[in-house]
Amino acid sequence: MYWFKNAMIYKLTKELDWSEDKLQQNLAQCAYHPCGQSDMSKFGWTTPLRGAELFCFSVGKQILLVAHKEEKIIPAHVIKRELDNRINELEEKENRKLKKTEKQALKDDVVSVLLPRAFSKNQQTAIWIDTEKNLIYVDAASSKRAEDVLALLRKSLGSLPVVPLAFANEPSMVMTDWIIKNDMPQWLVPLEEAELKAADDRGIIRCKNQALDSEEMISHLQAGKFVTKLALEWEEHLTFVLNDDGTLKRLKFADMIREKNDDILKEDFAQRFDADFILMTGELAKLTENLIEHFGGEKNRL
């Protein structure tokens, strides 16, 4: 099962048709196929459930998709060495300096020769679509990776009206108040790791194994710095780092959560996958609901 390690959350701004047949048909048009000899990269959908034919896995109103990206890796120094050799040989043979366009043509030829022998880097990115709350969760640590996967989904569906989930109250202001006023919600526990920034972004303090209510930390906050990242534990169910943009990084589910379905036999892979997906999405949905409520609800957009 794809236990999310990060969660970049997006809000759908209008209802879409998530019927399984239509979704499967749309995703199949952008299915992942391995790189051929002349391909530098391939990007498309793969089946979430091993051995299945569907590109979407759904339970109730929750849908799981998995994007697969394959990139051929040719070290830059290998290309440069081969290209330099070819340029030197040709310039010596023709007794002249090659033009820029000629060098580019040689480089393209070098890459095409090296491609069939290049190693592949494979990367999978999971997307969970909560069609009940109109939220999309992307298991990505960077906005670039998340946006790439959303672009693939948009291409598959023809339209994907989404915006990053935003709160009415700025997370950095709320997290700063938590520390200064020692007023953490009962369902959260701080984990002695944080990042503080000045309003002008010029000063950054990163701390680990540091009591957040220490005089040193409080003085930084009283001097005008804000909490922009904060490591937290939620209900003893999972730990994560909350960022000032509302994203959740370094998600780690507690053993007692991950082991809840251990009574299901390993041979029943599909049943365990199903149960774990229900479990994970249920936990993250509750956490998201807690955060939205505590941060004053979702931000109204004009």
UniProtKB/Swiss-Prot annotation:
It comes from the Bacteria. Belongs to the RdgC family. One of its GO terms (cellular component) is cytoplasm. The gene is rdgC. May be involved in recombination. Pfam families: RdgC. The keyword Cytoplasm applies. GO terms for biological process: DNA recombination; regulation of DNA recombination. The keyword Cytoplasm applies. It is found in: Cytoplasm, Nucleoid. It comes from Mannheimia succiniciproducens (strain KCTC 0769BP / MBEL55E). This is Recombination-associated protein RdgC. Coiled coil: none annotated. Keywords: Cytoplasm, DNA recombination. GO terms for molecular function: double-stranded DNA binding. InterPro entries: RdgC.
